[in-house]
Swiss-Prot record:
Described purpose of this protein according to its UniProt entry: Reversibly transfers an adenylyl group from ATP to 4'-phosphopantetheine, yielding dephospho-CoA (dPCoA) and pyrophosphate.
Subunit field text: Homohexamer.
Marked site (Transition state stabilizer) residue numbers: H17
Reactions it catalyzes: (R)-4'-phosphopantetheine + ATP + H(+) = 3'-dephospho-CoA + diphosphate
Binding site for substrate: S9, K41, L74, K88
Name of the protein in its database record: Phosphopantetheine adenylyltransferase
EC number(s) given by UniProt: 2.7.7.3
Highest taxon, organism lineage: Bacteria
Family classification: Belongs to the bacterial CoaD family.
Keyword Ubl conjugation assigned: no
GO-annotated biological processes: coenzyme A biosynthetic process
Cofactor needs: Mg(2+)
Gene3D superfamilies named in the record: HUPs
Length: 159
């Protein structure tokens, strides 16, 4: 069985994320969407448990996708779970420059390969950070987020 992981903070999960997850699910027998702690990002709008619930709801139509969370080294998770590849979406060359050293380190530490998928152009401008910012100022990002996430982000901003 070929297994892949799609790691990220997913705060919140966007349509761009779902596109990458869906494309990974077409190429692998099992895909784990892994909510990870990123020390370079603030604590986030949504708790880890909220993110897990929103991702589970948003990916329920994918029969070979599961959702988990992890706070340690990604390669420790891949090794412990027999995962063959890490799948990451790239929007721009800046994403590549950020992701490449991590991919090389993961390869060196555990021999796990990283598969880069180019973002579908219709999602290339979407980021979780941008969606949160636009929502805080009253903008509508509902077409950039899964329905449950669009509702949840509006509720978060109201509270």
């Amino acid at each position: 069985m070929r297994k892949a992981v799609c790691p990220g903070s997913f705060d919140p999960v966007t349509m761009g994320h779902l596109d990458i997850i869906g494309r990974a699910a077409q190429q692998y027998d099992e895909v784990t969407v892994l909510v990870t702690a990123n020390p370079n990002k603030p604590s986030g709008m949504f708790t880890v448990d909220e993110r897990l619930a929103l991702i589970k709801e948003s990916t329920a139509h994918f029969v070979n996708v599961k959702v988990d969370n992890w706070a340690g080294l990604l390669v420790d998770y891949t090794t412990a779970n027999g995962i063959d590849a890490i799948v990451k979406g790239l929007r721009t060359a800046l994403d590549y420059e950020y992701e490449l050293p991590m991919a090389q380190m993961n390869r060196k530490l555990a021999g796990v390969d990283t598969l880069f998928l180019m973002t579908d152009p219709q999602y290339g401008y979407i980021s979780s950070t941008l969606c949160k910012e636009v929502t805080k100022y009253g903008g509508d990002v509902s077409d950039m987020l899964p329905p449950a996430v669009a509702a949840a982000i509006v509720e978060k901003v109201k509270s």
